[in-house]
Design a protein with these regions (language model features):
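ATP/NTP phosphate-donor binding region
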Residues: 2-255, 262, 266, 273
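Eukaryotic beta-rich interaction modules
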Residues: 30-46, 53-65, 73-77, 175-181, ...
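Core residues of folded domains in eukaryotic genome-function proteins
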Residues: 48-50, 55-57, 70-78, 123-127, ...
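Conserved beta-strand elements of beta-rich interaction domains across eukaryotes
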Residues: 57-60, 66-67, 81, 134-136, ...
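Non-catalytic interaction/regulatory modules that flank or connect domains
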Residues: 128-132, 531-539, 545-558, 566, ...
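Generic C-terminus detector
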Residues: 157, 162, 166, 170, ...
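Catalytic core of DAGKc-family lipid kinases
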Residues: 207-209, 231-233, 239, 246-247, ...
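Catalytic phosphate-donor-binding core of small-molecule kinases
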Residues: 321, 371-382, 516, 547-549, ...
């Protein structure tokens, strides 16, 4: 029998943690708070013992082997969830004896406790802990998926072992949620599901497959339930959010490009109860479009790796359950009012954005190809641009904000997980993701079969059984991720219930609500305090996020809620070489001249108006084409809420 946890949980007991100094803790630093501790073993290594401690910092693993000791820690911020499972009953004709030797290639199969397929001869309870650990490299970093398996088998009855496992599960779930009052059974504060809306046409048309293969497994690990809807037509998401009882859900997650986020956002502002809706509901985004500016901005501001696995980065953001306030810009044309979160454009970038739609099938590369085309046949536009400069106090607040989400150091962070030499046989890759649009994707495009996703550390409490060779092979695993698309944690797939025609809940006339404008009428002259530039322009583009797309670092000083619009003006007369340098610099934020330039300038403003003289051209709001003509916009700081990693 192994040592029992130093801190126990009674049936109605709240853990009263005791402070304890972990190895490597500086005497001047506050001690770690230890909630649970237990001794585990690796059955294949007779002399290896792990003391596992759950602290306020994370899951501490102290390895003792042949007289040497090594301590590693998985930070709480990297853990997304855990589940208690038990072994699956063996197929008829196979050995049912729990102490039968398992070959090196055998894989343990686990099921839910009440699935009806459990192996009654195995009294062990298995706790699977899922973490995505930050790894740094010269290119920035990535998150490595690590699964820790704790096998509880100290007692003769499954119920007793499961009670111990559930105690650990509850404590981990509470701490990951940021709560320190821990009870033996986990009861989440929020029981409502997420509303997930997928635009299957976004980007290269693979959003549905990407959600199935890369997002649903992460939601399953975090035990996040959701209702899933597939859009049927343009503005479907907008109509759905406007008409439905959205308070049935605790948040909205859109899967697609920036366009579907724009739809959902404006659907909220078309509700009579818009103020309550934006106060209570947070919106998140999984980037499957061509641009993905907001998702990239969030990852950039919170120092999260994005380029290698953007969908994973955003899925982890969703499961963290955190949010930030988000500036929203009210935009007005001659016939329409809308609310924007990303940008307003006139000229070169808008031309590229709209005219490259014919190349949508090639994904984000369409922007590069059309940029070259537009640079060769450059257009200019006559008109007038007016703006309200941002106050100095706003500028100081913006530039003095610390860079959010810097990853702090720590003693003994888990550098490498201990893994059995087993490989994932990814069903999604073998079958081409179900024969859909992603059928020809290579293994390099599938998160499931990435080698960084196969790390497993398996530990067990003591007994006379040394036969455990763990390998998860259930609907939680990569080999059966197709089922998670429909069944993850009581989630519901709803798309076939919606009508193929009309609005999701019957037609009604849309009216835009939201905060009223504080600007002069669009037909009236601008007020005192506005500055005006009259002339010929190559482009005018206003942005309030750092990135307009994954590789367009447009406004490096921007924050999610700084109350500033960054207005870029490029006047006619700029040389093609200067424009080429500008376009090339957009990828790393070096596009703005470091010295005064008469043709290119970036101005921080709180409102602006564009008045074209001609009648032909493109104007865009959040990448969507809008009526060409006079347009004005003003920022409303911190009006909405968006999901963020921390």
């Amino acid at each position: 029998m192994v040592d029992k946890p130093k801190i126990g949980l009674g049936s109605e007991e709240i853990v009263n943690p005791s402070p304890a100094l972990s190895k490597g803790t500086d005497c001047g630093s506050p001690p770690h708070v230890v909630y649970l501790t237990e001794t585990f073993y690796i059955s294949s290594k007779k002399n290896t013992v792990f003391e596992v401690r759950l602290t306020d910092k994370g899951l501490s693993l102290k390895k003792q082997s042949n007289g040497s000791t090594k301590e590693q820690t998985i930070p709480l911020k990297d853990i997304i969830g855990c589940r208690c499972l038990r072994s699956k009953r063996k197929a008829k004709g196979s050995s049912a004896c729990a102490c039968t030797s398992i070959s090196g290639t055998a894989q343990l199969k686990v099921v839910e406790e009440n699935s009806g397929e459990q192996d009654e001869s195995d009294v062990s309870a298995y706790l699977y802990i899922y973490a995505y650990i930050m790894k740094r490299n010269r290119r920035g970093g990535f998150r490595e998926r690590t699964t820790i398996t704790l096998r509880f088998r100290s007692f003769d009855k499954y119920e007793d072992n499961n009670k111990e496992a559930q105690k650990w599960r509850a404590a981990i779930k509470y701490l990951v949620a940021g709560e320190t009052s821990i009870r033996p059974t986990y009861q989440p504060k929020e029981t409502r599901k997420l509303l997930v809306i997928i635009n299957p046409k976004s980007g290269s048309g693979k959003a549905r497959e990407m959600f199935q293969q890369r997002v649903a497994p992460v939601l399953a690990e975090a035990e996040i339930s959701y209702d899933l809807h597939i859009t049927k037509k343009s503005d479907w998401a907008r109509e759905f959010v406007r008409n439905r009882d959205i308070y049935l859900w605790r948040g909205i997650v859109v899967v697609g490009g920036d366009g579907i986020f724009y739809e959902a956002l404006n659907g909220l502002f078309e509700r009579e109860d818009w103020q309550t809706a934006i106060d209570e509901l947070t919106i998140g985004i999984i980037p499957c479009g061509s641009g993905n500016g907001l998702a990239k901005t969030i990852a950039h501001l919170y120092d999260e790796p994005f380029e290698t696995k953007p969908i994973l980065a955003s899925a982890l953001t969703i499961v963290k359950g955190k949010h930030s306030l988000l500036d929203i810009v009210r935009v007005e044309t001659r016939s329409k009012i809308m609310f924007s979160f990303l940008s307003v454009g006139w000229g070169l970038i808008s031309d590229i954005d709209i005219e490259s739609e014919r190349l949508r099938a090639i994904g984000g590369q369409r922007f590069t190809l059309w940029s070259v085309h537009r640079l060769i046949s450059l257009r200019t536009y006559q008109g007038k641009v007016s703006y309200v400069p941002a106050l100095v106090s706003n500028m100081n607040r913006s530039n003095s904000l610390p860079h959010e989400g810097g990853v702090g150091g720590g003693v003994g962070l888990l550098k490498h997980s201990i893994s059995y030499n087993t490989t994932l046989d990814c069903h999604d890759c073998r079958t081409g993701g179900g024969g859909g649009a992603g059928a020809n994707d290579s293994h390099s495009n599938c998160d499931a079969c990435d080698t960084n996703f196969s790390d497993v550390l398996s530990l067990e409490t003591g007994s006379n059984l040394d036969t455990f060779r763990p390998r998860i092979d259930s609907w939680y695993s990569a080999t059966s991720r197709k089922s998670t698309y429909f069944s993850t944690v009581d989630s519901i797939y709803e798309s076939d219930r919606a009508s193929n025609e009309g609005t999701p809940n019957g037609a009604n006339v849309a009216q835009m609500y939201g905060p009223p404008s504080r600007l002069p009428a669009l037909t009236a002259p601008v007020s005192d305090g506005w500055k005006t530039i009259d002339g010929e322009f190559v482009m005018v583009h206003a942005a309030y996020q750092t990135h307009l797309s994954t590789d367009c670092f447009f406004a490096p000083l921007s924050k999610l809620n700084d109350g500033i619009i960054w207005l870029l003006i490029i006047k006619a007369g700029v040389s093609r070489s200067q424009l080429l340098s500008f376009l090339l610099g957009l990828s790393n934020g070096s596009h703005i001249p470091t010295q005064a330039n008469r043709y290119i300038q970036m101005i921080p403003v709180t409102a602006f108006r564009i008045e074209p003289s001609g009648s032909s051209g493109h104007m865009t709001v959040d990448g969507e084409n809008v009526e060409y003509g006079p347009i004005q916009a003003e920022i409303f700081p911190s009006l909405a809420k968006v999901m963020v990693p921390k």
